Amino acid sequence: MDWINEKPWNGLSVDINPNISPHEMVYKAKLDLETSWNPTGGVRPGRPKSYANQEMFQFFKSFTEHGGVPLETIGTLDNGRIVWALATLKEEFTLMKADNVKAYLLLYSRNKNRDNIEIYFTTFRQAGGNTLQIPSKARTFFKNICRRPFTKQFPFISLEFHKFDESIIRKTKETITHGREAIIDFAKNAECLINKKVNNQIANRYMFDVFQPEISKNLSSIGNKEVNELADKKTKIGIEAITKAPGQNLETSCMTAWSLLNAVTYTVDHCLGSDQDSRLRLAWFGPGAKIKQRALELAQNL
């Protein structure tokens, strides 16, 4: 196992200046060609994809500008089907003067017409490069009001641009506020997690509870014998990551609930999936995201 220490989106994204235009974002994300997300080739009927992506990036840009959070990175997954962006929040925190955790707003679109925008808030632990979605009271779904309607006459698209009105600006600011509050609360929870000491028995059961809950409930104790005979690949990697993953040598992670949580998020972000693209897709938008949430709940209940 190679225990790499890098951002899970390395190679799948590009850092940007938040002041560039939506058109430039389309170009930088390599979404300016129809075939970039249509592997069978050809041109899809209706409005050109570049318009859809430009208007999606226009929403990203307007949302982050009105919310006061600068865009930092844009990227794509699944051959361009999913387009995402990260905007930096100022609510980053550091545990015991060494374990730095950054905070981001993640915006993304999985809808091929780019009519819908989804968001959530995530942390990024720099030691290890693992992410965790932070539950909040914020809205998670927005209609892309920047999309222009298709017309039957040349130029086949409305020339009227839709801008954020007072209502959507208010909702944007409320969403960002809820996200900031959730990150602040998580920072307090993280402080509690680093003060919860665990032993090997607790650590083994935790990993089984996260990855194989159907087995752990039938075991009175989980030692090396049970790990060797019953643990699947994910569970074994998670147990190994407790001590071997990057960042696990920090004082915050010396057999603490925090170290267990980060072992899981590292495993999901860096060790599962057939390739980096599928790994990040599953970690952010698929079963991996649910595994992380279960890991967070279990860590808080230790």
Predicted regions and their residues:
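Residues at beta-strand starts and edge strands
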Residues: 54, 81-83, 101
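Beta-rich nucleic-acid/ligand-interaction surfaces
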Residues: 72-92
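Intrinsically disordered, low-complexity regions enriched in serine/threonine
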Residues: 1-25, 29-33, 92-302
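Short linear motifs at secondary-structure transitions and domain/linker junctions
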Residues: 59-64, 83, 96-98
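N-terminal low-complexity, intrinsically disordered segments
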Residues: 1-78
